Regions:
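Amphipathic alpha-helical effector-binding/dimerization core
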Residues: 2-89
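Sensor-regulatory modules in signal-transduction proteins
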Residues: 125-128
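Regulatory sensory and allosteric helical modules in signal-transduction proteins
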Residues: 72-73, 79-94, 98-111
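Short loop/turn motifs at secondary-structure junctions and domain boundaries
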Residues: 33-34, 112-118
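Short hydrophobic/aromatic beta-strand element in the GNAT-like acyltransferase core
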Residues: 40, 110, 122
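Juxtadomain coupling helices with adjacent low-complexity linkers
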Residues: 92-100, 104-108, 116-117, 134-172
Length: 172
């Protein structure tokens, strides 16, 4: 026996049914433990983004978001990722150049964008067909985001985003 092209619809069905939350959660715990920053996972829903998973930093001063919290899609680091990758979403505050830079770099760093004393780094999570599936962020007090730490945080979350994307069927 040998596989034919008929397997593709079944494979696509399987890959699109993968649960990004279930795949991402153990990685989110690991990166939280490594970086001591809160880790969040967002999905787009119309003009909003929803936090579907959260692993809070284990320290008294942290950026706190609750699972199920809904935000305007264009706010914060996660919103900038959605704005750069979703064709049907255009943020009036984001230029075509900024959008192209985000897609080229594959991440966004914000400081005080949505919450004055918080900083965040966001990366896209892709699925089968390299479709934007979700956005993962790490966030914490703005004082934690020194130049040296940002390099460490960025390196870790970019690797994590690529790892989860590959498990979701992306071919980056």
């Amino acid at each position: 026996y040998q596989l034919s092209w008929g397997i593709l619809p079944m494979a696509k069905s399987f890959l699109t049914s993968l649960d990004v939350r279930a795949i991402a959660q153990p990685y989110m715990v690991a990166i939280r433990n490594q970086l001591q920053q809160s880790v969040n996972l967002f999905l787009a829903q119309g003009d909003y983004r929803i936090c579907i998973e959260r692993v809070a930093a284990d320290k008294p001063l942290r950026h706190d978001i609750k699972i199920g919290t809904v935000y305007p899609i264009f706010k914060g680091a996660a919103g900038k990722i959605f704005g750069a990758y979703l064709a049907d979403f255009k943020d009036a505050d984001m230029s075509a150049g900024e959008s192209a830079k985000i897609r080229r770099d594959g991440y966004v760093i914000t400081r005080g964008n949505r919450v004055p004393d918080a900083a965040s780094i966001a990366v896209p999570i892709f699925s089968f067909g390299n479709k934007l599936e979700a956005v993962m962020t790490i966030s914490g007090p703005i004082g934690d985001y020194t130049e040296e730490r940002v390099k460490e945080y960025l390196s870790a979350i970019r690797v994590l985003g690529q790892t989860i994307s590959k498990e979701m069927g992306a071919t980056l």
